[in-house]
Amino acid sequence: MSTPNQHAGKVIITCAVTGAIHTPSMSPHLPVTPEEIIVDSLAAAEAGAAILHLHARHPDGRPDQSPEGFAAFLPRIKQGTDSVVNITTGGSPYMSVAERTAPAATYQPELASLNMGSMNFGLYPMLNRYTEFTYDWERAHLEGSRDLVFRNSFKDIEYVLETCYGNGTRFEFESYDTSHLYNLAHFADRGLVKAPFFVQSVFGLLGGIGSHPEDVMHMKRTADRLFGSDLRWSVLGAG
């Protein structure tokens, strides 16, 4: 006879509708245009996604972190669903922190993602699976990650917090390794972030922690120890 899980509760499903990692040649189903992002966002909400994690793209699929890029789809998504809108401040590793933060600062969403530490960000292994690309930028985007550090310094994180917290925006703290959890604890100790802490543990991206079950348990144990009952834990497996 099984014992009921005393910690069971409602589960929050987040849909990252288009992201910034994958490129158009990888799937004809990747939303690129504003209309595609709108349609897929509303469909995700209808299917049960309580949070819509939103990025924007240029017409050729390149990541677009301009406020104007988000303006093309945000109003209709907000009007069409009551799901929580989460605007990325991660954007793309190739962008400055000011560029990455601009949409969240402009539109003041309920939720914004916030990467909690610098890291190598290896996308180039995907070149082993894809050899033909529709756009020239795609191969360079992936190949360039061999020599790419995704910068999220303490100063960068402070910039995002200082820019957005006063607008009422809460954060999804993107943590790609246990060091990122300790960085979050550091900001909590300084009073720059407040509980509860919505932690997104990201597994399987080259440069961060792996995706073995032991890795997952290690991240969860560390987060539990650091944040206790103030933790709201979420899991993302890199595709």
Regions found by a protein language model. Name each.
Residues V17-I38, T89-V97, R146-R151, E172, ...:
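Active-site mouth loops of central-metabolism enzymes
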Residues T3-H29, T131-W137:
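N-terminal small/glycine-rich loop or linker at the start of catalytic domains
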Residues C15, P63-I87, V160, C164, ...:
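Alpha-helix-loop-beta-strand connector modules within alpha/beta enzyme cores
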Residues D64, F70-R151:
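Active-site beta->alpha loop and helix N-cap motifs at the rims of alpha/beta catalytic domains
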Residues H7-I13, G48-A50, Q79-V85, Q108-E110, ...:
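Short, well-ordered coil/turn segments that N-cap beta-strands
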Residues I37, A44, H55, A112, ...:
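Conserved, mostly hydrophobic/aromatic
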